[in-house]
Amino acid sequence: MKTPWKVLLGLLGVAALVTIITVPIVLLSKDEAAADSRRTYSLADYLKSTFRVKSYSLWWVSDFEYLYKQENNILLLNAEHGNSSIFLENSTFESFGYHSVSPDRLFVLLEYNYVKQWRHSYTASYNIYDVNKRQLITEEKIPNNTQWITWSPEGHKLAYVWKNDIYVKVEPHLPSHRITSTGEENVIYNGITDWVYEEEVFGAYSALWWSPNNTFLAYAQFNDTGVPLIEYSFYSDESLQYPKTVWIPYPKAGAVNPTVKFFIVNIDSLSSSSSAAPIQIPAPASVARGDHYLCDVVWATEERISLQWLRRIQNYSVMAICDYDKINLTWNCPSEQQHVEMSTTGWVGRFRPAEPHFTSDGSSFYKIISDKDGYKHICHFPKDKKDCTFITKGAWEVISIEALTSDYLYYISNQYKEMPGGRNLYKIQLTDHTNVKCLSCDLNPERCQYYAVSFSKEAKYYQLGCWGPGLPLYTLHRSTDHKELRVLEDNSALDRMLQDVQMPSKKLDFIVLNETRFWYQMILPPHFDKSKKYPLLLDVYAGPCSQKADASFRLNWATYLASTENIIVASFDGRGSGYQGDKIMHAINRRLGTLEVEDQIEAARQFVKMGFVDSKRVAIWGWSYGGYVTSMVLGSGSGVFKCGIAVAPVSRWEYYDSVYTERYMGLPIPEDNLDHYRNSTVMSRAEHFKQVEYLLIHGTADDNVHFQQSAQISKALVDAGVDFQAMWYTDEDHGIASSTAHQHIYSHMSHFLQQCFSLH
């Protein structure tokens, strides 16, 4: 299931911050507001992306150089001085798309025939371009419909997956070496993930890991034998007389899971023989005795690797550190190098155990884990010791470790001003943990409170990406003194364009319930007047570890609703939400569909009490988990909401995948948590939908939250005699993102809200 923390888009113009309220670009008096002749941000503006936010995507290729695509040329830039040269001219890409350059910059992968599969996976064809010869390599080409391909960390070796088997090219012009031969569609996956590992565990299609100096290639093998298949029709072109049927091995809650094996192959041995024997590293006994997952792989050094394994009930994980035995040509994972991580209140990590960050010699590492108070902080694991020492602490959370040098560790946290929805870059001295400095907090505090960072290879330079609350800003910095070297992109052109638009403002604040702060955001109409009454739309996700109230910038559907329709669009992070400690996040452990649903209802009540919300025009909408919560809220009989929209909702947790669902709910068996599985369905609340207006939307080719989920809601509502609206999107997946479907769904939802709120 898509988690909102992974996705950052954008919301208003360059903003000034008044305490915790962002305000529009241009401040007008009431008289001036009444005479404001500027146009509003329209639905067409959103659907056609009239106003585009610019980013600056760079690829570090050394500790002081990076590549950047400009006007279809690939430029090589010097970080210190800013001078650039053309690395690849745009004529190289006339028939192909740029994919990646080898670490030694001698070869470039060019991609074509791209075909999307699931969220991350796709197939494509590739050509290899010789930079020095300025021509394509025509001998020993990579096969069409390759599933994954990646350069080695040094030089120009290639590993790729074709027809579920792994191949390696030692030189681009030489024949490929076949590493595996067991691959079988929908059964055995070598070096790539099956559906559930792609979506819920690795968040990627790749299951290949090169060692730092290319000597070894590690890979996972997934076996889906016995995993039940989900099947659905794909209607395709209208000339197709019989629809196609799509089959996917998809383990639902309580069903047979894929099994996993882990191997390492010595690539250097390929030079002396046509094949190399992979060596299997088994899971530790404490997890291997039952169903389990491989959830993280990190090379510490050329001959040391870290593997994290997780029990199917995801409150127990083991990190095994394995070393290469040069004499016996084997890998050893001694028990004294195993580190157990457990949770007694919920699950391990936010979505899985955090990855370790090793020192350069691989002897010790740093990792984000929960401290004794339940906040995610950085702990240092010294050499040959199982216990760790926390180097950060407080009632806030470290989001990610971004870089580790011999002297400092760099991390992103939400410590600044005790605002969970903020993100800033910090550095901490490894020899003195009291020496902590925020590198971004004071750079541009009105415009920038939500940062991301990208470090060069050895962290000598870094790019800061400010993602809000004002317009995104990208700058380049030097680590030695943190001087800003140059502005890479400031979105000044967009700023000028938005001066002529009546933009909404954004309020980020909290309410206190049961002595606990819960944060919310509101997108307020232009010239907001708290003495007036506005319709309210609650935009909800509310899944475990989600966050909707943050300081990032967005131009989206809510921008249109607030600017043109004068609707307040609010989001609330209640119990179950993330980045505020395990007490809040684990509150919904083993009881999805309860507290997070109640909290959205209570939030709406609190918003009405603020005085500027029309209590008779309150709506709710959400997508995916948000569609589930929307439906559960509307089916609660609370009397708070007039209408709502659920897009691609879960309706019964036994219908959803095992990895995600069981993380929070356990198993749907009588000995575990079957009762709550059965008591948390949307269908059981069908009778209460007579009190509300309901729009149900789903794509027929949703591989993630299957159409079955909405079909069962529809059936229950019909059986209960409920009048409701429904819309399906033929052959659309979970994102309903094709150009025509995207425009249609947002137009349709807009019309539904206009009718519900009596706007036109």
Swiss-Prot record:
GO biological process per UniProt: behavioral fear response; cell adhesion; endothelial cell migration; locomotory exploration behavior; negative regulation of extracellular matrix disassembly; negative regulation of neutrophil chemotaxis; positive regulation of cell population proliferation; proteolysis
Regulation: Inhibited by GPC3 and diprotin A.
Entry-linked Gene3D superfamilies: alpha/beta hydrolase, Dipeptidylpeptidase IV, N-terminal domain
All ranges on the Cytoplasmic side of the membrane: 1-6
PTM description: The soluble form (Dipeptidyl peptidase 4 soluble form also named SDPP) derives from the membrane form (Dipeptidyl peptidase 4 membrane form also named MDPP) by proteolytic processing. N- and O-Glycosylated.
Compartments, record wording: Cell membrane; Apical cell membrane; Cell projection, Invadopodium membrane; Cell projection, Lamellipodium membrane
Membrane topology field: Single-pass type II membrane protein
Catalytic residues identified in the record: 624, 702, 734
Keywords for this protein: Aminopeptidase, Cell adhesion, Cell junction, Cell membrane, Cell projection, Disulfide bond, Glycoprotein, Hydrolase, Membrane, Protease, Receptor, Secreted, Serine protease, Signal-anchor, Transmembrane, Transmembrane helix
Extracellular topology ranges: 29-760
Disulfides per UniProt: 322-333, 379-388, 438-441, 448-466, 643-756
Enzyme class: hydrolase
EC number assigned by the record: 3.4.14.5
UniProt-listed Pfam families: DPPIV_N, DPPIV_rep, Peptidase_S9
Catalytic reaction list: Release of an N-terminal dipeptide, Xaa-Yaa-|-Zaa-, from a polypeptide, preferentially when Yaa is Pro, provided Zaa is neither Pro nor hydroxyproline
Complex and partners: Monomer. Homodimer. Heterodimer with Seprase (FAP). Requires homodimerization for optimal dipeptidyl peptidase activity and T-cell costimulation. Found in a membrane raft complex, at least composed of BCL10, CARD11, DPP4 and IKBKB. Associates with collagen. Interacts with PTPRC; the interaction is enhanced in an interleukin-12-dependent manner in activated lymphocytes. Interacts (via extracellular domain) with ADA; does not inhibit its dipeptidyl peptidase activity. Interacts with CAV1 (via the N-terminus); the interaction is direct.
Cited PANTHER family: DIPEPTIDYL PEPTIDASE 4, PROTEASE FAMILY S9B,C DIPEPTIDYL-PEPTIDASE IV-RELATED
Similarity field: Belongs to the peptidase S9B family. DPPIV subfamily.
UniProt name for this protein: Dipeptidyl peptidase 4
Organism: Mus musculus
UniProt gene name: Dpp4
